[in-house]
Amino acid sequence: MTGKIKIGINGFGRIGRLVARVALARDDVELVAVNDPFITTDYMTYMFKYDTVHGQWKHHELKVKDEKTLLFGEKPVTVFGCRNPEEIPWGETGAEFVVESTGVFTTKEKASAHLKGGAKKVVISAPSADAPMFVVGVNHTEYKSDIDIVSNASCTTNCLAPLAKVINDRFGIVEGLMTTVHAMTATQKTVDGPSSKDWRGGRAASFNIIPSSTGAAKAVGKVLPALNGKLTGMAFRVPTVDVSVVGLTVRLEKKATYADIKAAIKEESEGKLKGILGYTEDDVVSTDFIGDNRSSIFDAKAGIALNDNCVKLVSWYDNEWGYSSRVVDLIVHMSKTQ
């Protein structure tokens, strides 16, 4: 595939808008279309330009050309408002890759509707029950060009998997438990409200620490089969708007001091996993990672070892920006695999 990779985005929520920001700031991809049936173009412009967490968009002047076109500088982006994915005419815009970021069409069958509109490939920006999951830096090289629908897994899996890979490759993981202290997301409630499937999840997000389930740790077993059945985990939703942190407690096959583990992670962060896995010895807190495009930043000072076989590791992630960056990275990798 030559030239810029043309992408479309279905669903202009948190991840959809940030994938757009990432794409527009890069020179190897081109945003050509956005679909969202619930947002007008003028409101879309406002939501894109002003962001409470990531700040005001200042790269290009942004304006509405007409009700079906946005202008990023001189670059037109077509806007659709279709509720049914198969009705979105991606082919008219040349969109080869579609980012499915509504959170609704997350199965292969549902996401395949985009192919009927002319898209060549679909990347689901969420875990999927049946689409193959790829985590950049972990198993993305296993992607084959005949796979049309993929999942970029979850933000937490993208944080955990690179860390788990390094530890398992170097020392072996017997078993482990993960806890993610996770920033609140759009699915939560501003004040106590109905949430019949998750009673605790219906409590006020800004005033509570809320225990929650997550499939992120088990999903690591899908991208790293050697760890299948060895990891599980849970989440605490906390009253912050962005940046989350994983605590991974593992029992090791090979004895290793905490210094050995730090050295291994540092080496990988400067080698094969550079740009994916980070390493810091600074006295950091969550807001220090807003806008960090790495998937996982290991906090060397925060971890602890019980002994040479049992250790707790801590790694930060901007659950919005880092994840959105990987969505685009995965698209670029897929295009090169054609």
From Swiss-Prot:
The protein's Enzyme Commission number? 1.2.1.12
Cite a GO CC annotation: cytosol
Reaction(s) catalyzed by this protein?
Answer: D-glyceraldehyde 3-phosphate + phosphate + NAD(+) = (2R)-3-phospho-glyceroyl phosphate + NADH + H(+)
> Where along the chain is the active site annotated?
C155
State the top-level EC class: oxidoreductase
What residues does NAD(+) bind to?
R14, I15, D36, R83, N319
Q: What does this protein do?
A: Key enzyme in glycolysis that catalyzes the first step of the pathway by converting D-glyceraldehyde 3-phosphate (G3P) into 3-phospho-D-glyceroyl phosphate. Essential for the maintenance of cellular ATP levels and carbohydrate metabolism.
Q: Which family does it belong to?
A: Belongs to the glyceraldehyde-3-phosphate dehydrogenase family.
Q: What is this protein called?
A: Glyceraldehyde-3-phosphate dehydrogenase, cytosolic
Its ancestry begins with:
Eukaryota, Viridiplantae, Streptophyta, Embryophyta, Tracheophyta
Gene it is expressed from: GAPC
